[in-house]
Amino acid sequence: MMLSKKNSETLENFSEKLEVEGRSLWQDARRRFMHNRAAVASLIVLVLIALFVILAPMLSQFAYDDTDWAMMSSAPDMESGHYFGTDSSGRDLLVRVAIGGRISLMVGVAAALVAVVVGTLYGSLSGYLGGKVDSVMMRLLEILNSFPFMFFVILLVTFFGQNILLIFVAIGMVSWLDMARIVRGQTLSLKRKEFIEAAQVGGVSTSGIVIRHIVPNVLGVVVVYASLLVPSMILFESFLSFLGLGTQEPLSSWGALLSDGANSMEVSPWLLLFPAGFLVVTLFCFNFIGDGLRDALDPKDR
């Protein structure tokens, strides 16, 4: 009986090992991510927030720039249809929070996409080529990283005025710098692997090695960093808008709404609470998802 129990345990462990070995990296990562309750709950909440910012302006009877002269600085009210209340100009806060969420999320996701594309290609090329080329590319990266970014944004706003496109350009210019440095470090360790040497011996071009062999092997790190980059970029855009360097009226972002709400929080606290609540919850969701992806893709846990 004891022997049978040991045999069954051995067979069970062996089958579990075969099951793990039979799964790919991404299948195993997905399984472990789905077991992370905080990450899954955050993903669900984030999807609900995304649906809200997309659908709320379409379903609402008010536009983001409509003025209700009879309901200026009105508290949240179910009967009037202003569920989040109105601002000092009589504009519906629910719609403005949704429109602001669209812009804030677009800025965060766009910055992450720029970081993924530009940073991954730049870092992998720099690390793979090495030598003087790597030194020159890294010095250029350090120069860009040391540039006073706030001064650059103020300069853009002074010459071209407040424009959401300028925010995309300004944030996109700095979002990829850290990504490139991280990918370069990963590439330096990958370029000594046997499969890279085999590709070199087989006559595969530099671009082919980078795109087909190096980039797929750094995607785990890239995905994790990109998921953690989105909330930092949203927060940075909110900071710019809070200072008055972001979106221009009548458009808004969560940062601009926070700035407006902070000026009247004593008499109209809902103007601060609703955009602040959405911003905080979104940032927490992205950070929990990033932590979940990091744990799921960590090779030490495989």
Curated annotation (Swiss-Prot):
Periplasmic topological domain residue ranges: 60-102, 161-163, 235-269
Cell location: Cell inner membrane
Domain ABC transmembrane type-1 intervals: 101-290
Parts forming coiled coils: none
Keyword Cell membrane in record: yes
InterPro entries linked to this entry: BP-dependent_transpt_permease, MetI-like, MetI-like_sf, OppC_N
Keywords assigned by UniProt, alphabetized: Cell inner membrane, Cell membrane, Membrane, Peptide transport, Protein transport, Transmembrane, Transmembrane helix, Transport
A molecular-function term among this protein's GO annotations: peptidoglycan peptide transmembrane transporter activity
Membrane topology: Multi-pass membrane protein
Transmembrane segments: 39-59, 103-123, 138-160, 164-183, 214-234, 270-290
Record topology, Cytoplasmic segments: 1-38, 124-137, 184-213, 291-302
Role of this protein: Part of the ABC transporter complex OppABCDF involved in the uptake of oligopeptides and of the ABC transporter complex MppA-OppBCDF involved in the uptake of the cell wall murein tripeptide L-alanyl-gamma-D-glutamyl-meso-diaminopimelate. Probably responsible for the translocation of the substrate across the membrane. Plays an important nutritional role and is involved in the recycling of cell wall peptides.
Family assignment from sequence similarity: Belongs to the binding-protein-dependent transport system permease family. OppBC subfamily.
Name listed for the protein in its UniProt record: Oligopeptide transport system permease protein OppC
Organism from which the protein derives: Escherichia coli (strain K12)
Lineage: Bacteria, Pseudomonadati, Pseudomonadota, Gammaproteobacteria, Enterobacterales
